[in-house]
């Protein structure tokens, strides 16, 4: 068994395709709508060997604290705990949709502060046979961002997950997410 696995992973042959589109629309005065769609797929060149266990997608949470050595890619979805919407080994397909309304409180040189409200939906799948872009986990919430040139982007979000996480029956409820130097 160990010899077979060594041969299987001797040469990692895979491809990873990701699409991400972000659109900003000025609604009224300083109010801005940010809409975003993401999609990712991990495939194998040699179907006999299957998909590699590395570079898989893990959906859920804010992405902080995802220290791993297997090259996993964390897809942030507020309102849920980190990596809670994927299987233990990760998934090969994901999609995510989000709408965010932003309003600047101050746009000074030393610190830009803005408030936001969001709705998001996303999911992870084990392949295209399971893929259904309308079967997603949904969340909504509000947050605050501050950008300071000395520190970068800092923020806090309060998200409510409307759907149960994998293996659960109840709604997820409220989650607090901290943002440090990254864009949601």
PLM ranges: what are they?
Residues 1-105, 117-118, 125-127, 166-169, ...:
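C-terminal outer-membrane beta-barrel translocator/porin domains of Gram-negative envelope proteins
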Residues 61, 110-112:
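Glycine-centered secondary-structure boundary/capping sites
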Residues 100-108, 131-132, 145:
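Hydrophobic alpha-helical bundle architecture
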Residues 28-33, 106-109, 146-156:
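Repeated loop/turn-to-beta-strand initiation elements of outer-membrane beta-barrel proteins
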Residues 60-69, 129-184:
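C-terminal beta-signal and terminal closure region of outer-membrane beta-barrel proteins
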Residues 37-41, 113-124, 133-137, 159-162:
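Active/binding-pocket-proximal capping segment
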């Amino acid at each position: 068994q160990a010899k077979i696995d060594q041969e299987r992973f001797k040469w990692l042959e895979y491809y990873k395709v990701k699409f991400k589109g972000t659109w900003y629309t000025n609604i009224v005065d300083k109010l801005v709508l940010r809409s975003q769609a993401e999609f990712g797929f991990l495939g194998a060149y040699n179907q006999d060997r299957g998909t590699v266990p590395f570079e898989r997608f893990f959906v859920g949470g804010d992405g902080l604290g995802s220290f791993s050595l297997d090259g996993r890619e964390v897809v942030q979805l507020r309102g849920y705990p980190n990596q809670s919407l994927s299987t233990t080994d990760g998934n090969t397909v994901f999609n995510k949709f989000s709408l965010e309304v932003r309003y600047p409180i101050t746009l000074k040189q030393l610190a830009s502060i803005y408030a936001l409200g969001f709705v998001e939906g996303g999911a992870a799948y084990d392949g295209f046979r399971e893929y259904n872009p309308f079967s997603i986990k949904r969340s909504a919430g509000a947050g605050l961002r501050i950008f300071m040139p000395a520190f970068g982007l800092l923020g806090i979000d309060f998200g409510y997950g409307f759907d149960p996480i994998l293996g659960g029956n109840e709604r997820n409820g409220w989650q607090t997410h901290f943002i440090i130097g990254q864009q949601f």
